[in-house]
Amino acid sequence: MSYQYSQEAKERISKLGQSEIVNFINEISPTLRRKAFGCLPKVPGFRAGHPTEIKEKQKRLIGYMFQSHPSSEERKAWKSFSLFWQFWAEEKIDKSFSMIDNLGLKENSGSIFIRELAKNFPKVARENIERLFIFSGFADDPDVINAFNLFPPAVVLARDIVVDTLPIRLDELEARISLIADNVEKKNNHIKELELKIDAFSERFDNYFNNEKSNLKIINELQSLINSETKQSDIANKSIDELYHFNEKNKQLILSLQEKLDFNALAMNDISEHEKLIKSMANEISELKNALTILCDNKRKNNELDYINELKKLTERIDTLEINTSQASKVSVTNRFTKFHEIAHYENYEYLSSSEDISNRISLNLQAVGLTKNSAETLARLTLATFVSGQIIQFSGSLADIIADAIAIAIGAPRYHIWRVPVGIISDMDSFDFIETIAESSRCLLLKGANLSAFEIYGAAIRDIVVQRQIHPTNYDHLALIATWKQGPATFPDGGMLAELGPVIDTDTLKMRGLSAILPQLKPGCLAKDKWTNIDGLQLDSVDDYVDELRALLDEAGFDGGTLWKRMVHIFYTSLIRVPNGNYIYDLYSVLSFYTLTWAKIKGGPVQKIEDIANRELKNYSAKISS
C-alpha cells in the first residue's frame, strides 16, 4: 500500500490550514485515533497514553507537516498522517478499504483511484469521496471531477435508501396498524365495562347524596374527635421527647455502669486467681513447717552440718513465701490495664461520617497545635488515607506526640487509649490484653514511644489486626491506630518493623505558624460509621493506571519490599487517591517519601535511588505546570 504524498498534495493540504487538519483528525473515532497516535514516537516528560501526551503528539505532527523545507521529520510526519487518512477512509467508506497496490504518484493516479473506489463502493456519498481525495497524497487531476460524478450526492443517497426501505417500512406500518386496531377494539370493550361501572356508581352516589345530612353530622363528629386526638397526640409527642432525652441520659449511665461491671468482672477473676495462689502458698508453707519440725527433731539427734544448712535454706524459703503471700493479697487486678490510659469525651463531640468532615476536623486540630493550614490539610489527607487502609499512621521528630494527640482527639471520641511503651518489653501479653478486653469499645489506640521496644515482640496482636485488615474485614475496623517514635540511643533505629505497617511523617519537616498567631481550640470528634472504609465522599474513579505507575517506579528503583508490604503500599496509595482534594503527583511523592523510603532503610534497599526518583517526578511535574 502506498503512503507517499506528492508535493502538490502537501501544498493542497497545507493551504487548508491547521484547524482544518485538526478537524479531519477529530472526525476519526477516539479508538482509532488513539491507535494512530500510539504509532508515533513517545514524547519525553509525558505519561504514555495520557490525553496531554496525545495532544502534544498532534501538535508536533502538524508542526512537522507544515515545515517549508524537506527533512526526515517532515517525511515521517506525512507518512504518519497517511495512517489517519486510512482510518478515516475505513470509517467513512468501508472497513475493507485499502489502497491499490503499485498505483504510484502518476498524474492520473487520483482519478484511477477514485474510479476504482466507484467499482468497489458505489454507494458512498460524493462528499465523502471528495474529502477523501482532498486529504490524500494524490496530485490534482482534471479527470478527477468526472470520477467524482460516479458517486451519488449524500442527498440522493439518502433518498435512495429511504426508497429502498419503503416496502419494509410499509409492512411494519401495516403490522402496527393491525395491532392498533386490536388495541382499539379492546379499549372499546373496556370503555363499555367502565360505562356499566359508572352507572352502578351513579346509582350508589345518589343513595349517598340522599343521606347528606346524616353524613355531615358524622363528619362533624369525626372532626371533633380528630381535634381531640390531635391534642392528645401533641401531649404524647411531648412525653416521647422527654422520654427520649431521659433515655439518652440512661444510655450514658448504663454504658458507664457496664464498663464498671466489665472491669469488676475482670477484677473478680483476677482476685480468684490470686486467692488460689495464696492457698497454694499457704499449703506449701504448711508442708515446709512440717519439714522444718522433722529437721529440728533430727538436729537434736544429730547435729551434723548438712542438717544445719538444710534448715537455713528452709527458713529462708518460708520467709520468702510469707512475704510473697502478703504482697499477693494486696495486688490489684487493675495493674494489668493501667498502662492503657483512657481519655474520655462523653460530651460536646461531633459525629463525623464523611471524608470531608473527618479531614476538616483533623486539619483544624492540627492547626490548633500550630501547623499552617496547608501542612495541616496535607497531613489530614495522609492520616485519613491510613485509617481507611487499616494501617498505622506514624510520626517522628520533636512534635510527634503533640500532633498524635491532636489527631486522636479529632476522631477518638467518646473514648480512646494511650499506651506509653516502656523500654525493653519482652512479652506480647499486654497487646493481647488490649485486643481482647478494650479494643472493641475503644475508638483509637495511640502508641507513644513505639520504637522503645521491639514492636515485633510486644505488638504482635496489633500487627495481626493490621495484616488481617489488608485481607478481610475484622471486628476492629473502627479502631484507628497511631504511633510516635522517640529519639535517642535507647530506641530502635528507623522504627524497626513498625515501618512496614504504615507511612512515617517527620514532624520537624512540617511548617508551623508564627508565635503571634491566634490558634483555634482542640475539638473532639467521633467516627459515625462502624468501619473507616464505609465513610461517605470517597472517590470511586479507577486508579489502576496510578498503581501501575507506582509499580513501574519501584521496579525502576530495583526495590522489593516483600509481598505484604507491596499489598499494603498499594492499598494505602489507592486510599490516598480516593480521598478528595488531592493531586496524584503529590500523592505519588508522599508514598515514595513517607512509606517506601522508611521501609527501604530497614530492608537495606536503594534509599538514594528511591529519593532521586521521587524528587525527579516532582520536578518534572513542576516544570510541566510552569511551562
From Swiss-Prot:
Subcellular location: Cytoplasm
Inactivation phenotype: When this gene is missing the Druantia system does not confer resistance to SECphi27 in E.coli.
UniProt main location, coarse: cytoplasm
Protein's gene: druC
Function: Component of antiviral defense system Druantia type I, composed of DruA, DruB, DruC, DruD and DruE. Expression of Druantia in E.coli (strain MG1655) confers resistance to phage lambda, SECphi18, SECphi27 and T4.
Keyword field: Antiviral defense, Cytoplasm
Protein name: Druantia protein DruC
GO CC annotations on file: cytoplasm
GO biological process: defense response to virus
